[in-house]
């Protein structure tokens, strides 16, 4: 029985993780739950899974959460704020922590879990993208396992099982192409929020669905792969694979290529991250290659996906630049979802923000440097958005 704490329990990753726990109660037990603000769903989860400790990041919701739990027949420890989430992450009984918090908000609780000696099932890619220079030394110092729980990096990790040290030659990340893979570039100026949220293959949260549409998601995954697997950026490629059956591939030194295949289902990488090195039997739909039909591939259109190149540039710049890229993207996507800027403005404000940070970058940033860069980038995006020409905006900034 593996005891786990779950950060971001009410989001897409969190609810799918709890589906796994519910299906395999003899394998996994939830001892900690944390979320940002969804009191109603968190209370339902507490009632079902009966964790020892619960936290809600939004401190204004603490009273509502306590009221919702008061009528239950047991009393978990209830906390609030960033420190409360960190306490869930470092909770003594947990062996593994699933990090499903969206964005850079997952960095500090993940560090808390690592410092407490917890293994990490990493579904929050921003932890490594922004904090890689700090997180990786901590992983080594505390001797914990860092297991990727997103589909692409789980696929790479699975393909690497049995590959000797030095055997990896190239990583090939597959991308669905997002909501606009079949749209002509000329039509992207007319994109609405509703258009961007129509992912063709995966069921995900709003932010990551927009990231898929811009291909920033894949660019961020390139940076994550660099940190996870120690691969130079020039040896990490992206290919559009519309069917999302091949979740990623590796090329080894003799040019053999290994791939991991499966229906697009986030539970698969989550289960592997929780159960590694074991393989647990599931009754989920098995992959039928005949039913899947043709598997096709094409090169990403650089004109359609400028965010992809911004990510490579930030990765190569190193230091705190990936943190700036990540924060700028989070802020830009939030503005787009709020209809404050247009879809095509997302890469514009990110590029301007990264350019303005270039002279302030440090090659070996501390955690404080990274957090400061994150804060600076969010403010810089707001300023860049204010300076956009009004002809490109969905509505003007308030």
Curated annotation (Swiss-Prot):
Q: Which cofactor does it need?
A: Mg(2+); Mn(2+)
Coiled-coil spans in chain = none
**Its pathway?**
Isoprenoid biosynthesis; isopentenyl diphosphate biosynthesis via DXP pathway; isopentenyl diphosphate from 1-deoxy-D-xylulose 5-phosphate: step 1/6
Source organism's superkingdom?
Bacteria
A GO biological process of this protein is: isopentenyl diphosphate biosynthetic process, methylerythritol 4-phosphate pathway involved in terpenoid biosynthetic process
Listed EC numbers: 1.1.1.267
One short Pfam name that applies is DXP_reductoisom
Say if the entry is tagged with keyword RNA-binding.
no
**Swiss-Prot/TrEMBL keywords:** Isoprene biosynthesis, Manganese, Metal-binding, NADP, Oxidoreductase
* Enzyme kind, highest EC tier: oxidoreductase
Question: GO molecular-function annotation terms?
Answer: 1-deoxy-D-xylulose-5-phosphate reductoisomerase activity; manganese ion binding; NADPH binding
SUPFAM superfamilies the record matches: 1-deoxy-D-xylulose-5-phosphate reductoisomerase, C-terminal domain, Glyceraldehyde-3-phosphate dehydrogenase-like, C-terminal domain, NAD(P)-binding Rossmann-fold domains
Q: Which residues bind Mn(2+)?
A: 150, 152, 221
What is the catalytic activity of this protein? Answer: 2-C-methyl-D-erythritol 4-phosphate + NADP(+) = 1-deoxy-D-xylulose 5-phosphate + NADPH + H(+)
UniProt key word Plastid: no
Residues bound to 1-deoxy-D-xylulose 5-phosphate? 125, 151-152, 176, 199, 212, 217-218, 221
- Binding annotation for NADPH: 10-13, 38, 124, 126, 205
User: What family is reported?
Assistant: Belongs to the DXR family.
Q: What does this protein do?
A: Catalyzes the NADPH-dependent rearrangement and reduction of 1-deoxy-D-xylulose-5-phosphate (DXP) to 2-C-methyl-D-erythritol 4-phosphate (MEP).
What PANTHER family does the record point to?
Answer: 1-DEOXY-D-XYLULOSE 5-PHOSPHATE REDUCTOISOMERASE, 1-DEOXY-D-XYLULOSE 5-PHOSPHATE REDUCTOISOMERASE, CHLOROPLASTIC
Q: What is this protein called?
A: 1-deoxy-D-xylulose 5-phosphate reductoisomerase
Please report the organism this UniProt entry assigns to the protein: Crocosphaera subtropica (strain ATCC 51142 / BH68)
Which gene is this protein's source?
dxr
């Amino acid at each position: 029985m593996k005891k786990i704490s779950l950060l971001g329990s009410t989001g897409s990753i969190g609810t799918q993780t709890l589906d796994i726990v519910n299906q395999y109660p003899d394998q996994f037990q939830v001892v900690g739950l944390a979320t940002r603000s969804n009191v109603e769903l968190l209370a339902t989860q507490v009632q079902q899974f009966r964790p020892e400790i619960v936290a809600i990041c939004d401190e204004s919701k603490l009273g509502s959460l306590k009221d919702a739990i008061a009528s239950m027949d047991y009393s978990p420890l209830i906390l609030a704020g960033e420190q409360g989430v960190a306490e869930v992450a470092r909770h003594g009984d947990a062996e593994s922590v699933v990090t499903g918090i969206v964005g850079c908000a997952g960095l500090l609780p993940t560090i808390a879990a690592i410092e407490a000696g917890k293994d990490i099932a990493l579904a929050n890619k921003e932890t490594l993208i922004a904090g890689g220079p700090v997180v990786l030394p901590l992983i080594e110092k505390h001797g914990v396992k860092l297991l990727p729980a997103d589909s692409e990096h789980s696929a790479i990790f699975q393909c690497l099982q049995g590959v000797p040290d030095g055997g990896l030659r190239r990583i090939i990340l597959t991308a669905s192409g997002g909501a606009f893979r079949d749209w002509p570039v000329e039509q992207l100026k007319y994109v609405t929020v509703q258009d961007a949220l129509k992912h063709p293959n995966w069921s995900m949260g709003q932010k990551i669905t927009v990231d898929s549409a811009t291909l920033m998601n894949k660019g961020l995954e390139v940076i994550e792969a660099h940190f996870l697997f120690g691969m130079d950026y020039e040896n990490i490629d992206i290919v559009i694979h519309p069917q999302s059956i091949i979740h990623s591939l590796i090329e080894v030194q003799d040019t053999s290529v290994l791939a991991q295949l499966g229906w697009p289902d986030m539970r698969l990488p989550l289960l592997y991250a929780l159960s590694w090195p074991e393989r647990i039997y599931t009754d989920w739909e098995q992959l039928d290659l005949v039913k899947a039909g043709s598997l096709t591939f094409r090169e990403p259109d650089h004109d359609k996906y400028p965010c992809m190149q911004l990510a490579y540039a930030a990765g190569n710049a190193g230091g705190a630049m990936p943190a700036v890229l990540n924060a700028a993207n989070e802020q830009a996507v939030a503005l787009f979802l709020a209809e404050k800027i247009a879809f095509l403005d997302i890469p514009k404000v990110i590029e301007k923000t990264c350019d303005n940070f270039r002279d302030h970058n440090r090659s070996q940033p501390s955690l404080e440097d990274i957090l400061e860069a994150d804060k600076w980038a969010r403010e810089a995006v707001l300023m860049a958005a204010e300076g956009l020409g009004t002809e490109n905006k969905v509505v003007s900034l308030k």
